[in-house]
């Protein structure tokens, strides 16, 4: 059997993805999993790596790819379909006009991301339940977690981010994020190497003053002065000292 050569970048991605899966017990043998492929570099990178890990028998799972066509102007998934066909994975591209809902409900000048993501998430959860998926796989990476933590603190007054694994409020779906240790720059490099047929999000990309972009710039500026800043922020998510916070419920538990 001929050994398939993989790049240094893919090896690095494999290392951090398998580490996260092991550390947080994200995948079990025989799981029926649904990978959400948005058409962006992150989910493409995760799909390529996870498919390779299944092919070389690292994981014994049933992988299904789900893409939601939100009826945005200019959406063209022909190359995405070709890529998935060539990869040989089970997939479905489902069309729902969430774009029309967003345009109708969001006032001019406001960002679409919040409502758009809620509608997308609702369709993902529905599809997963209808098809009895054990896990929903999302492509959020280390930088997403870091930015989300700061956004929650700065704009919502909450300390929260994106956990590696969580169960939805109704208890029906388990969501996992195998790339919580992966840096975005490695996914950018991998996308260049693999030449993924990326579908840009014109809806969000046209809105320049998004909060996430501001936070990303803030982190980059801080990292320029101290390169350890991003990893320190990430490490803070697993190094919580409740006794040094102001949550009265937590303090009552600790003190009693």
Curated annotation (Swiss-Prot):
Any one GO biological process: tRNA thio-modification
Pathway assignment: tRNA modification
InterPro entries on file: Rossmann-like_a/b/a_fold, TilS/TtcA_N, tRNA_Cyd_32_2_STrfase, tRNA_thiolation_TtcA_Ctu1
Cofactor binding, per record: Binds 1 [4Fe-4S] cluster per subunit. The cluster is chelated by three Cys residues, the fourth Fe has a free coordination site that may bind a sulfur atom transferred from the persulfide of IscS.
Motif (PP-loop motif): 38-43
Cofactor: Mg(2+); [4Fe-4S] cluster
Keywords, alphabetical: 4Fe-4S, ATP-binding, Cytoplasm, Iron, Iron-sulfur, Magnesium, Metal-binding, Nucleotide-binding, RNA-binding, Transferase, tRNA processing, tRNA-binding
EC number: 2.8.1.-
Pfam families: ATP_bind_3
A GO-annotated cellular component: cytoplasm
Record's miscellaneous remark: The thiolation reaction likely consists of two steps: a first activation step by ATP to form an adenylated intermediate of the target base of tRNA, and a second nucleophilic substitution step of the sulfur (S) atom supplied by the hydrosulfide attached to the Fe-S cluster.
Record's subunit section: Homodimer.
Protein's recorded name: tRNA-cytidine(32) 2-sulfurtransferase 1
Organism, scientific name: Francisella philomiragia subsp. philomiragia (strain ATCC 25017 / CCUG 19701 / FSC 153 / O#319-036)
């Amino acid at each position: 059997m001929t050994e398939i050569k993989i790049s240094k970048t893919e090896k690095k991605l494999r290392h951090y993805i398998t580490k996260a899966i092991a550390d947080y017990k994200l995948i079990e043998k025989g799981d029926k999993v649904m990978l959400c492929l948005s058409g962006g570099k992150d989910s493409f990178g995760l799909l390529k790596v996870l498919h390779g890990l299944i092919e070389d028998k690292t994981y014994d799972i049933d992988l299904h790819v789900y893409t939601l066509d939100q009826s945005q102007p200019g959406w063209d998934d022909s190359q995405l379909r070709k890529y998935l066909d060539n990869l040989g994975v089970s997939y479905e591209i489902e069309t729902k006009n969430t774009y029309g809902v967003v345009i109708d409900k969001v006032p001019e000048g406001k960002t679409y991301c919040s409502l758009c993501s809620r509608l997308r998430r609702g369709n993902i959860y529905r599809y997963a339940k209808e098809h009895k998926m054990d896990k929903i796989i999302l492509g959020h990476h280390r930088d997403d977690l870091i930015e989300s933590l700061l956004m929650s603190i700065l704009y919502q007054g909450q300390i929260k981010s994106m956990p590696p694994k969580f169960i939805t409020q109704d208890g029906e779906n388990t969501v996992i994020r195998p790339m919580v240790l992966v840096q975005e720059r490695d996914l950018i490099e991998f996308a260049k190497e693999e030449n993924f047929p990326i579908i840009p999000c014109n809806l969000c990309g046209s809105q320049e003053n998004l909060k996430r972009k501001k936070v990303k710039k803030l982190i980059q500026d801080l990292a320029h002065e101290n390169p350890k800043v991003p990893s320190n922020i990430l490490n803070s998510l697993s190094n919580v000292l409740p006794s040094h916070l102001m949550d009265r419920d937590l303090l009552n538990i600790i003190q009693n």
